[in-house]
Amino acid sequence: AASDVYKRQKERFDKDNFIKNLLLDNLLLVDIYNRAKKLHIEVEARRLVFILETNPDKNSGALESVKSLLGTKSGDFITAVDEKNIIIVKELAPGEDYAQMNKVAATILEAAGRDEEGKTHVAYGTIVKEIKEVSRSYKEARMAMDVGKIFSAENDIYAYSSLGIGRLIYQLPIPLCKMFIKEIFGNKSPDDFDEETLTTINKFFENSLNVSETSRQLYIHRNTLVYRLDKLQKSTGLDLRVFEDAITFKIALMVVQYMKYMETLDY
């Protein structure tokens, strides 16, 4: 019996090790198939990778909670790569698609326990059909986590397949971003605008550049809004009532968000 327990533990350790190396692209193609066969891991199953990022102070419990939630399914693998991130490689049942995966993401979030500081997020990649593609789904989930935290910080679930324009901005080299911002704003940065101006701009975008609706929601007179937009046009040369200028401004704000996020990362 003791040897059985040892065997089971060794197999679990070997599987965990295999999945970690698979995610990090540390295996040759031939090794992937040989080791998967030895460990009785299905090579042609549909899978998707989730990343759960939690508050390190709460993480010890999160891993166990997620394991007890999903760990009963033999095709799913759950592993922690560092003190903040838990990786779930989920095997999909026939007919399961992204709508179900979004529900799984919500369940994972519940299991981990939402924290008030907003440091708990789940991101996931795309569905892959072969074991060798799992690392791609993992990279996509990683990117979704970054892009989501930069551009949709108010949400806590990020799907790689719906990152929108943020995905494009995230791939831009920082020097190019700086050049773009300088070209549009000169030595100013959109950050330099006061809170009132930024609130006005964001509300105006939310309401599809509709002056009446924006002024109503901001509880200000229409003329006050027009005055603010005129003032903005004077200082930037961009008239947000003109679609093309509005797009330029919106992208510039997103580029600045991205640059700020990259600065906060510990290099």
Give the location of each predicted region.
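Cytosolic nucleotide-utilizing catalytic cores of signal-transduction proteins
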Residues: 29-49, 53-267
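Short, small-residue-biased leader/transition segments that mark boundaries at the very start
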Residues: 1-6
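Amphipathic HAMP/coiled-coil signal-transducing linker helices
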Residues: 9-23
